[in-house]
Regions:
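Exposed, low-structure sequence patches enriched in small/polar residues
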Residues: 1-292
Length: 292
């Protein structure tokens, strides 16, 4: 069995809400959020969470650093500030503690996450800058002690929305320190148009180069209707994809996607039963929707 209670309070510029749950595991999980608007252009948030290592619920979903509503407690602090016009500055810091062993950590461990972003919009142009620093304890090579894995990721992006068409340029960089230091970057360009009657076309292309798997680059990619993905890239290569939407009638919707990843540093992709004896991978998707 499982049961939970939701609660909340709001007064003026202050709001509080939360949820506490338990069940047949006889353990507790709770998350509580507070926000306060200090000024018309400045808001702060505080999130406290505690998920017992014994707690279990089949359909539980909540904010967490470890990806599960279990074996975690932590505090999140964030703020949004609009100093002027189209500029939005955001920052958050999150500290988490995992009292029991987890993947790649054979004893209690900790993690720290910080992110700063700036978004400036003027007319049809949007400029974005982001920096993230994350530290997480993991087992050393001999599994005799925990050491920190430190990830630093930065992004610069420019988006121009021309109404019936748009174009976006983006540069990602990463530095990872875990046993050794590794670096990586990716430069990508994407755009699309809806100017052609009944059609919508989107295309992306990106070049990536990383030292190894630890410095993998994650990049957003459009997918089918109601779908998207954040594939990871490591090594050296190019990723390009094309998406075409066709709406011949109000009831029929056709969408196709073709994408290819060409690697310059290997002659095989994947391992074991998923190994491909080639330096490239191609994925093709087709979706049809009919409204009754």
């Amino acid at each position: 069995y499982g049961m939970s209670v939701d609660y909340g309070y709001r007064s003026g510029l202050f709001s509080f809400r939360g949820e506490t749950a338990t069940g047949s595991s006889h353990a507790w999980a709770t998350i509580n959020t507070m926000s306060y608007r200090l000024a018309s252009n400045f808001t702060m948030r505080l999130v406290q969470r505690y998920y017992s290592y014994k707690y279990y619920s089949l359909f539980s979903q909540s904010y967490s650093d470890g990806g599960r509503v279990q074996n975690e407690s932590g505090v999140y602090v964030g703020a949004d500030w609009k100093p002027f016009g189209g500029l939005l500055l955001s920052y958050y810091a999150d500290a988490a503690y995992f009292p029991w062993a987890r993947y790649q950590a054979s004893t209690a461990s900790r993690s720290f996450d910080n992110l700063f972003s700036a978004v400036y919009t003027t007319g049809r142009l949007t400029l974005t800058g982001r920096y993230r620093l994350k530290k997480r304890q993991k087992d050393n090579a001999d599994k005799t002690a925990l050491i920190y894995k430190t990830d630093q990721r930065a992004r610069l992006a420019a988006l121009y929305d021309g109404g019936s068409w748009s174009i976006k340029a983006q540069i990602d960089g990463t530095t990872t320190v875990f046993k050794e230091r590794s670096n990586g970057y990716m430069a990508s360009l994407g755009g699309g148009t809806t100017a052609i009657r009944r059609f919508a076309i989107y295309a992306t292309c990106g070049y990536f180069h990383t030292d190894d798997y630890y410095s993998s680059i994650y990049s957003y990619e459009r997918g089918m209707l109601y779908d998207f993905s954040f594939p990871s890239y490591y090594g050296e290569g190019i990723r390009y994809a094309l998406i075409v939407k066709y709406m011949p009638t109000k009831r029929l919707y056709v969408m196709a996607k073709a994408g290819t990843t060409d690697y310059f540093d290997r002659s095989q992709v994947g391992t074991a039963l998923q190994q491909v004896d080639a330096s490239s991978l191609t994925d093709i998707q087709l979706q049809l929707r009919w409204k009754f």
